[in-house]
Amino acid sequence: MKKTVLRAYARLIAEVGARVQKGQDVVIEAELDQPEFVTMVADACYHAGARKVTVTWKHQALEKLAIRRESVKTLQTVEDWERAKLQHYVDTLPCRIYLLSEDPDGLRGVSPAKMASARQGRYSVIKPYRDQMEGRYQWCIAAVPGVAWAKKVFPNETKARAVEKLWEAILHTCRVHDDPIAAWDAHNADLQARCDYLNSLGIETLEYRASNGTHLTVGMIPEAQFCGGGEYTIGGSYFNPNLPTEECFISPKRGEAEGIVYSSKPLSYQGQLIEDFSIRFERGRAVEAHARTNEALLQKLIAMDDGAAYLGECALVPYDSPINQTGILFYNTLFDENACCHLALGMGFIDTIRDYPNRSLEEMRALGVNDSMIHEDFMIGTPDLAITAHCRDGRSVPVFRDGTWAF
């Protein structure tokens, strides 16, 4: 891949994704196999005005080794130096950039129960720090092809060609062409216009129907609003948290989901694929879950904590989105969630609540924003998906027909 194109992508991440501000610190998190592109992103951050750029390197093989060799108690422990680093982030609010390149199968073979226990133990310590930073800093998740990931997506290609093809797909879906920054300005404007229309309807419930058996009704929080594309921090900095993105999303009301929904794409979770699954909801809670493969893993996901069985997101994405048009299953939620409509189990987004900077976390939980240690997207979009908005004034308005926007 031409370095000029990669530098344009790095600039997009720094200036449109994270929207680095002059004098701001930046923390980049990436795998060890990406030193060249990480250097490009760091350089782009400095050009955008960053005061300091720090890189946190990860290595999936070491993570797998630790899960296998360390005790659950050790894995759950948040060391004093980790707490100090988290407090430093609370105090300084650095911009965060996450570059994904991991092998989708990289954690295969480790105990899902052990991973879940480790995560649960750490979450209780980390959550207060996370809550203090909520909505106060910019962050961006973007992707870089790793060899194992590329071979998973393109198994019949050589390693070099698989990486090249994955680069091409990433750059295409992220609109990295003649003028990517202008393209993203236009894309954000289109998503915002759709959100504005949806927010004007006064939606009480969304009703999903598809020929695969999906029939689900989800309640909306009156104070919630659809968001899409870029978003603002409490301090007013505009950024794009996901590159790419095609969704208009909202956090539904905890306790108000009735019916059944069927997946339309596999869910890659903990190095394994959960395929052809369905989830049935009663009073908002997932009460039944079945899958053709890895049903036990799906049920373990839903039982991760109390909030994991409730919905945290409803996202509207047309079935003919640029990502779906590639015909590629990326085995990566950042991309696959933007291929078609999806729901998410677990944590809701407080920034979908109007006037959220002036509300307490407790108030937003009381409104119905779900809380959980997980947030797992799963795809439900189909070519015939119909979504109807039932509004508080009694109207029923088509939102999706035949898998795409009805307006």
Predicted regions, residues:
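Short solvent-exposed loop/turn micro-motifs enriched in small/polar/acidic residues
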Residues: R11, N199-L201, Q270-Q272, G307, ...
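Dual-mode signal for accessory low-complexity, basic/Gly-rich regions
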Residues: E288-P357
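Extended hydrophobic packing segments that form well-structured cores
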Residues: E362-F407
